Amino acid sequence: MLSKYNKLYYRREAVAMDYDEESSTLTIPAGMNLKYISYLLGRPVDDNTITNTYDPVSIKLTGFPRSELQNDLIKFLIGLDQYQFNGNMTQLVGNAETGECKTFCAIAAISFLSMKTIIIVNRKNIVKNWIDSIDTYTDLDRRRICELNTRMIEKIMDDPSIVKKYRVFVTTHRTIESNAAKYGWNWIRCLFANIRVGLKIYDEAHMEFHNMMMIDFHSNVRRTFYLTANMERSSYDENSIFQKCFKAVPRFDQVKLGYTDSKKHITMFVNRYNSHPSVQEISACKNVQGFNKNAYSDYQVTSDTQFFEILDQYVRRMTVEKGFRTLILVSKITSCDAVKEFFASIYPGLSIGVYNSSIDKHEKQRVLDEDQLIVSTSASLGFSETIANLRLVINCEAFRSKITGNQASGRLRRLGDDIMCYYVELVDTGFASIRAQFKERESRYKKQFKEIIYIK
């Protein structure tokens, strides 16, 4: 129920449970239907509601909600009006589309609840975004916000009194995971007790599933918020477990609550074309797991004679002639370089930047701030980062996950009531796998965008 089968090692591995051999204790997520679990086991299940002592804090909000959705999400998180029963809940899910300012809503909740807080993100560069947002939306002095890295953790464990000056902690999953691997998860339990937080917030809560569960098992925090634009996992097996873990957790679901206009400023182009791959080329894009998107990315930039021609149609008409800031997503770092070289050769005056793990952080920031055409991978820039004034996203990747498409189009933030943005997907119909992948996610697209234009 809470484990998945590892096809590589031919074994089942725990995903959302933890077993302590010394005490013979099995820990499972509190968000499950515990009465049903008790029925299955034929014995009582203890609901551990013992929480750490936390410090109250005073943080004043300096901004206001800019939409009815934001206002409702804040009420949901703090338990006001129609959501008053949430005031007694220890776990809440905030599921709203990218660009709807979940960050602001969470910061507003911190202010209203007056609890010392820890925010856990999945990437280091997002730490600064949260610190900047707290600085922007509240009166809190930046010196009261702690970037909880390994060095700071060691200081706190040596001298817990230093946490008194901090009101908010921001850290990454990797930081907690690496310290747990080094010292053990019980040591993490001590850390959370020492920092005296009453509220724990996960950003992009669908990303680090196993680590998030382990933190929950060993943190004993009064309240936890799970924020995401996609409360699901890409893997069918993992998503089945994921949904069980949050079955009993109240969920603010933007779409189900009727807020369906978050992407009505986006027109989608589905550009279907047939690159006429040979049997050998189709075979080369497969492995034992199925379709290989990295091999396909190599095929695009080396053998697909139509690929750059189609890309150029959009870049010439919208990026060069109309001046749109543009993001092109491919699957590999080498493909990023190939795309940049192609456009640099035909548009020498166009500012083009590459954003991926091979680029240092200062250059990455410069690319986000300055370049008109950005080439990246979805793993590097598919989520979380904000690109100011972005008008066009061209997604060249082969992918099955609805989440990936949602995150990619989510880079296109609303720029004004009358300003349209454009999301393009290239669908090579010469590959049956790519046709099938698009068909799986097409139904969701029809509900999201203002319109979908099919190009054949």
Predicted regions and their residues:
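Conserved RecA-like P-loop NTPase helicase motor core
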Residues: 357-444
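Conserved helix-turn-beta segment of the N-terminal RecA-like "Helicase ATP-binding" lobe
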Residues: 125-152, 346-350
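N-terminal pre-P-loop "Q-motif" helix
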Residues: 63-90
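Conserved two-lobed SF2 helicase motor
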Residues: 163-182, 368-383
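Post-DEXD/H (motif II) to motif III coupling segment of the RecA-like Helicase ATP-binding lobe
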Residues: 199, 204-265, 445
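Walker A/P-loop
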Residues: 84-109
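Conserved interdomain linker/interface between the two RecA-like ATPase lobes of SF2 helicase motors
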Residues: 251-326
